[in-house]
Amino acid sequence: MAKHLFTSESVSEGHPDKIADQISDAVLDAILAQDPKARVACETYVKTGMVLVGGEITTSAWVDIEELTRSTIREIGYIHSDMGFDANSCAVLSAIGKQSPDINQGVDRTDPLEQGAGDQGMMFGYATNETDVLMPAPITYAHRLVARQSQVRKNGTLPWLRPDAKSQVTFAYDNGKVVGIDAVVLSTQHAEDIALPQLKEAVMEEIIKPVLPAEWLSAQTKYFINPTGRFVIGGPMGDCGLTGRKIIVDTYGGMARHGGGAFSGKDPSKVDRSAAYAARYVAKNIVAAGLAERCEIQVSYAIGVAEPTSITIETFGTEKIPADNLTALVREFFDLRPHGLITMLDLLQPIYRETAAYGHFGREHFPWEKTDKAELLLRDAAGLK
């Protein structure tokens, strides 16, 4: 693999699937703020004029599902029927039950350290040294483009932008290293009265140029800005949205493997979410320690069992110490039992709504992005405890 291209995409907070993710995580946060031991599995469906919030929730907390839903949509920016969706007038339906007692008996334990996994499954974490946040460049810059779209929409720089948008960035690699950007796609919903030439110029000057490093752009870089020519109908009016349908956008943009489990709306007892965060934490600390240039961790669980059924490390030939030694370090310094990783990363906090747009990884303020174990790993790897 000497020279190759790699592409990742992202979507804005106003994309229908991301509206659903944010509502699910807003419900989760509101419950965790009152009841950190709650069990939450909240799913959301959005379509023109309606929102359905469902799932299984067991908690002592009370939250106003309807108001949470409306306020979330309002913050995203759907506040008028002209946009095809209005937080103030859409119907909000609720269909929420309790978590199955069969699951409860496998998860809950008298000794918290023996807390079982909430389900079986495998989760992956990944890190690479190709960006400052130790994330793949394609997904990092795809996220930054749509985040910038939101910023200039909300601060009035480009007031004719609307909430729904998508980005896609194709990077060129040579021998595993980024050498440039081959193509950029940015599609953004807009008001009906904006002309396409004006939109293209504004998007280039206010969104693309401020985000993408100039040294990676060239005369050969291709730009596709609203390539269909018109994007007035968007959001839930254009497509229905569902929680958990953007799992590649949420993670590594396809650069790493994915276990298949979505994140949003799930409390940390669900290892689909918490173990994926812990796996990112492990991989990032290995790369931050300089023990590998790229690192992918797989961890797997059996429902009701505390200890992971497997921990596997792949470093793609970039490791500085033998893989067996890396695995031993991970087992020594990271507690990947459900209760252990929840405690290690302080996951029983209402911090999840923010994760539901622009990526769960590569954003330094989240606890799973800390590199506080890197020095310990490096010291131990060198035999200097």
UniProtKB/Swiss-Prot annotation:
Residues given in the record as Mg(2+) binding sites: D17
Location(s), subcellular: Cytoplasm
Region of interest (Flexible loop), ranges: 99-109
Name of the protein described by the UniProt record: S-adenosylmethionine synthase
CDD domains reported in the protein's UniProt record: S-AdoMet_synt
Stated role: Catalyzes the formation of S-adenosylmethionine (AdoMet) from methionine and ATP. The overall synthetic reaction is composed of two sequential steps, AdoMet formation and the subsequent tripolyphosphate hydrolysis which occurs prior to release of AdoMet from the enzyme.
Keyword Manganese: no
InterPro entries, alphabetized: ADOMET_SYNTHASE_CS, S-AdoMet_synt_C, S-AdoMet_synt_central, S-AdoMet_synt_N, S-AdoMet_synthetase, S-AdoMet_synthetase_sfam
Catalytic activity: L-methionine + ATP + H2O = S-adenosyl-L-methionine + phosphate + diphosphate
Residues bound to L-methionine: E56, Q99, D239, K270
Top EC category: transferase
Record key words, sorted: ATP-binding, Cytoplasm, Magnesium, Metal-binding, Nucleotide-binding, One-carbon metabolism, Potassium, Transferase
GO cellular component, one term: cytoplasm
Binding of K(+), residues: E43
Main localization (coarse): cytoplasm
Ligase keyword on record: no
HAMAP family: S_AdoMet_synth1
Protein EC: 2.5.1.6
